């Protein structure tokens, strides 16, 4: 528990403030939106998973952390540290997402809490795992957010690909796009499995020692013997 609190403290004050603001905005949206709006897929399959990925990319920094070299030198293994930092940020976002679900269920009695959880958790875990993998491989700041944002946007713009066989099983926003064959639970299970595979890849690559660069021990210009006194 102390480790989680320490990681959240490192994340800074902006993280809980922005997350709480998003939760409040979605609660207001649930109260003001009409009854014909399918609120659960929009809020918990599309919006909150994207924010979970952004939070991991921006506040659970791995190689882009300024202290990464010191942490890597002092830690016996890098992967457990990455896992703790990811879990701290992802769990905090998920707790506020759950609080938003409870508030939305009170405002809109037709919403099912179990359905909202199943819409959110696998999708958010998949996108956040993509952000974690990119952050664990690249020291470039904001690159995980960029990659996840592009993936999110491309997925929304390519809903027509659902006509192809098999695409619906890996499409991250199937309920939002329209589940024609009732396979959205299988789709969420596939997303969770892909997220675990991404973490397995990160675990293998995180502990891989960096490749040694070329040696520069030989001087570029040999000193002139005549100039040596």
For the regions a protein language model found, what residue spans apply to each?
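Hydrophobic alpha-helical transmembrane segments
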Residues: 1-45, 50-62, 125, 136, ...
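Positions in alpha-helical segments
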Residues: 6, 66-69, 116, 132
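Short helix-to-coil transition segments within interhelical loops
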Residues: 70-79
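A cytosolic-side transmembrane-helix exit/cap motif
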Residues: 60-70, 134-138, 163-172
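Membrane-interface segments at the starts/ends of alpha-helical transmembrane spans
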Residues: 115, 174-187
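Transmembrane helix segments
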Residues: 141-180
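Secretory targeting signals
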Residues: 24-61, 83-148
